[in-house]
Amino acid sequence: MKRCFLFAALMTALSTNGQSMDALLKSVEQNNAQLIAYKKAADATKSANHAEVVMDDLELGYNRLWGNPTTIGNRHDISVSQPIDLPTVFGTKSKVAKGKDALADDEYLVRRQDVLLEARLCYVDAVYYNALINELQRRCEHASAMSAMQKKQLEAGDISIIDYNNMRLTLSNTSTALIQAKAERDAVLAQLKVLNGGIDISVTDSIYSPISLPENFDEWFETVCASSPTIALTRDGMTLGRRQLALAQQGWLPKLSLGYMSEKTLGEQYQGVTIGMSLPLWSAGKKVKQAKAEVAAAESIHTAAIEGLKSVLSSEYALTKGLIKAASEIKSTLLSTDNRENLQKSCRAGEMSTLENLVSLTSYYDAVDKMLSSEREAQRAYARLTMYLL
């Protein structure tokens, strides 16, 4: 329930048009072939875990002994016995099985997290290519209009063939960039299709919603630790290790067996209840020592996992913050320095040459490209930063 709440909260704050992202991730989770296989494997593992928490098999015995001399007849023995764990041991075995179930679930959630992150990164890339394609289409339209105007000016003798050819090259380069961007977007959508189990999935968004970074990293990191399947895997590993240690310590307890036995000879028969006990004198000590070592190792792994995750997320947090600032500054500059209409008017009025127009537009276009790229990288960094909340 807690994970569902965190997932819903994350989807509300995501930086890529929430509902569209939410629907995409849900679709991938339902249809991804790897996740379906991992889920089946986890269920099979849990079934195997509980198959071990049963009573030992019933033991049946039959003896036929020939008498010597023959006058004493033969002896027939029949025995049935059932080994029985003490209730304490049986309860601990059940807890160990449940601990293994938790690990199987954690391993599935780690794989789920990786698949959903891959899908989310593809979504970020698709939005970037949509925005880039829209921008390149506008540039093609502008270059096409300028080329048509330059052709008329060339025919009128107002410009040289060099100016006209420069504009044609600009149009050709822009058209090529547009074709390349569409091909790269198709590749991203093809990858999304694979992640979605072979089902087509479309992405129409071309604008990112603003990223809202947590103000207090340490407090936010505590939330991540509480919900991260990677940390849960090591935490549940510690819990399982402690339960296995308790089971090993209970290995010193005797094991009982109850049964029935019948002995039949010539003219005589004995039958009744049998009670047995096995004493673990030799193996229990080594098992306890091994279990203690495994608990210590699990605790070290858990501590290292938390420290490693904090280091990674701290780096991603700083990177995301820097990329957001860079994209914001470029966007602010572009809004205050957009001279495209003025450049087009000046060129038509003959106030500036085609070369001057192209140089000015190229500077502006380079800034737009950097802005789109910075936004994309910021979104990708944010996706990696929040992947543990998926």
Regions found by a protein language model. Name each.
Residues 98, 161-170, 292, 354-362:
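Short, charged, amphipathic alpha-helical segments
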Residues 37-49, 111, 115-138, 145, ...:
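Amphipathic alpha-helical coiled-coil segments
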Residues 114-227, 316, 323, 342, ...:
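Periplasmic alpha-helical coiled-coil/stalk elements that build and connect Gram-negative outer-membrane
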Residues 26, 30-36, 43-57, 79-96, ...:
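A glycine-/polar-enriched beta->alpha junction
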Residues 16-59, 84, 92, 158-159, ...:
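Bacterial Sec-pathway N-terminal export signals of envelope proteins
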Residues 1-24, 29, 390:
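Bacterial Sec-dependent N-terminal signal peptides
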Residues 58-95, 204-214, 256-292:
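Small/polar, glycine/serine/threonine/aspartate-rich low-complexity segments that form flexible
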